[in-house]
């Protein structure tokens, strides 16, 4: 298989720290989110970015990847072999084991006992809207074929139609029994594990079972109260902004969060007061009238007090 340049995909350098890589991931995930991107290959680019993040965000996997990338042009690194726990070892590691195996050639020539096939793990990107209901998904992956020494000889493309249940969460694992690699000598097949990755949303942040959305309001809407249209995962609603609202105030919308078998979360609208552009002469006069009318108000009266 082709070894992808995950750093190039993320637009970062191999020396960058995790914080820099995470920032790049969030930016690209939002850029290529199919709900907002107009690019024809947005979904493919989004999945590629998610794949790169899955490796570079894990310290051990990133170190293994860096080593493989460093030696990618070495013919000895054209193959890998795997243990059942999912670990991968390069050809140099294999040399020691290879000599050990041939030292026991007589025993290897006997009939080996039945052995269970290897499990396979793949990441599935799910959009927030898709978590509300059960939906079908076509999954494509490569089924490795191992030789007697645990080394991959070839990979066979495989496609499955699967159901992703409603209420799946980030990191949740879904088991598809028997869809891993075939067993040896009559042993059972391994399993396929789907690891759910909830894609970042351009509007909503996940907080447990709840969702948060930042709602921009004008100063007069915050002061006088208003009704504003706010999106949810299903449809738009009319949110009441109470008079005297403050920046950062959280307004709860019950039952509009994430759905699971046990509970349904809420949506929290976090108010953000947005000032109008630089005022003209008439607008400045109105602001001055307001300032004169509220001259006794000191917003910093309790500032810094415990």
Swiss-Prot record:
Q: Which domain of life is it from?
A: Bacteria
Q: Which UniProt keywords apply?
A: Chaperone, Cytoplasm, DNA-binding
Single GO molecular function: bent DNA binding
Provide the protein's localization: Cytoplasm, Nucleoid
Q: Which InterPro entries match?
A: DNA-bd_curved-DNA, DnaJ_C, DnaJ_domain, DnaJ_domain_CS, HSP40/DnaJ_pept-bd, J_dom_sf
Span of the secretion signal?
none
Q: Where is the J domain?
A: 5-69
User: Pfam families, from UniProt?
Assistant: DnaJ, DnaJ_C
Q: What is its main location?
A: cytoplasm
Offer a single GO CC term for the protein.
cytoplasm
Does the keyword field hold Endoplasmic reticulum? Answer: no
Biological process terms from the Gene Ontology for this record are: chaperone cofactor-dependent protein refolding; protein refolding
Record keyword Endoplasmic reticulum present: no
Write out the function statement from the record: DNA-binding protein that preferentially recognizes a curved DNA sequence. It is probably a functional analog of DnaJ; displays overlapping activities with DnaJ, but functions under different conditions, probably acting as a molecular chaperone in an adaptive response to environmental stresses other than heat shock. Lacks autonomous chaperone activity; binds native substrates and targets them for recognition by DnaK. Its activity is inhibited by the binding of CbpM.
Recorded protein name is Curved DNA-binding protein
């Amino acid at each position: 298989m082709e070894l992808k340049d995950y750093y190039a995909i993320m637009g970062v350098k191999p020396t960058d720290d995790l914080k820099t890589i995470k920032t790049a991931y969030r930016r690209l995930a939002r850029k290529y989110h199919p709900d907002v991107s107009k690019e024809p290959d947005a979904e493919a680019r989004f999945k590629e970015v998610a794949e790169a993040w899955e490796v570079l965000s894990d310290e051990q996997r990133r170190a293994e990847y860096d080593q493989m990338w460093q030696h990618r042009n070495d013919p000895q690194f054209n193959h890998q072999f795997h243990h059942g726990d999912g670990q991968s070892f390069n050809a140099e590691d294999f040399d020691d084991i290879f000599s050990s195996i041939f030292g026991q050639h007589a025993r290897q020539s006997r009939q080996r006992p039945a052995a269970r096939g290897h499990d396979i793990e793949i990441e599935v990107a799910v959009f927030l809207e898709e978590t509300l209901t059960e939906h079908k998904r076509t999954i494509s992956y490569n089924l490795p074929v191992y030789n007697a020494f645990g080394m991959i000889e070839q990979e066979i493309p495989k496609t499955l139609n699967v159901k992703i249940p409603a209420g799946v969460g980030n990191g949740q694992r879904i088991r598809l029994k028997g869809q891993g690699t075939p067993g040896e000598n009559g042993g059972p097949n391994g399993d396929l594990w789907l690891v759910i990755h909830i894609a970042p949303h351009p509007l909503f942040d996940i907080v447990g079972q709840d969702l948060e959305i930042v709602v921009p309001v004008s100063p007069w809407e915050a002061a006088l109260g208003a009704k504003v249209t706010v999106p949810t995962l299903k449809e738009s609603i009319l949110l009441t902004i109470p008079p005297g609202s403050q920046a950062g105030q959280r307004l709860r919308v019950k039952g509009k969060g994430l759905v699971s078998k046990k509970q349904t979360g809420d949506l929290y609208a976090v108010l953000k007061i947005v000032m109008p552009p630089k005022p003209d002469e008439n607008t400045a006069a109105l602001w001055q009238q307001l300032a004169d009318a509220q001259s006794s108000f000191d917003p910093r009266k309790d500032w810094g007090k415990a």
